[in-house]
């Protein structure tokens, strides 16, 4: 079994560790901002052995800190080091927009992630929602197609796996939210 944990910050609540421990036949992938990682958290994950965190990054320091707050990039890098040093698998999640598409899918960024120990990246397409959605941040059709090309190139030329939520949708039958819940 495999479960993805989304919404909020899963490392903020201690009861998640009890769930991971109780269901040790399930592999969990919690998506995290990475700000709560320290030796204690890394040791717990090492002991559990069934949790693969996905750190949210919007690119390098400039892109990540401008979207997520000053100092977040460095904190995520520290968290990655803690996990890598313990042999704990982890990956990265990026919300792609016109501001960061060239960074998060660049060879330089992927090479940095590989050196840090990341095994994979998820690319999610920015969708404008809320009271004041900014459609200018949405990827253009050509940028979406280019992301698919870059994703396939990374998969075939690097020891790294990428999932492009837009272009890979046909392989998984599309988005279940759009098919069953909306």
Predicted stretch roles:
Residues 1-6, 13-125:
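Radical SAM/AdoMet-radical enzyme domain recognition
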Residues 126-182:
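A C-terminal junction/extension of Radical SAM enzymes
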């Amino acid at each position: 079994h495999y479960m993805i944990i989304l919404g909020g910050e899963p490392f903020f609540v201690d009861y998640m560790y009890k769930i991971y421990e109780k269901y040790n036949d399930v592999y969990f992938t919690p998506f995290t901002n990475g700000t709560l990682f320290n030796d204690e958290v890394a040791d717990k994950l090492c002991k559990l052995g069934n949790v693969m965190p996905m750190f949210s990054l919007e690119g390098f320091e400039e892109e990540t800190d401008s979207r997520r707050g000053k100092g977040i990039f460095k904190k995520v890098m520290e968290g990655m080091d803690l996990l890598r040093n313990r042999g704990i698998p982890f990956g990265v999640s990026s919300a792609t927009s016109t501001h960061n598409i060239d960074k998060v899918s660049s060879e330089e960024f992927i090479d940095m992630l590989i050196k840090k120990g990341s095994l994979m990246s998820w690319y999610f397409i920015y969708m404008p929602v809320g009271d004041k959605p900014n459609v200018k941040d949405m990827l253009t059709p050509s940028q979406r197609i280019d992301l698919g090309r870059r994703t396939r190139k990374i998969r075939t030329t690097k020891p790294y796996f990428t999932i492009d939520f837009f272009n890979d949708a046909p392989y998984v039958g599309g988005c279940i939210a759009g098919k069953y819940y909306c």
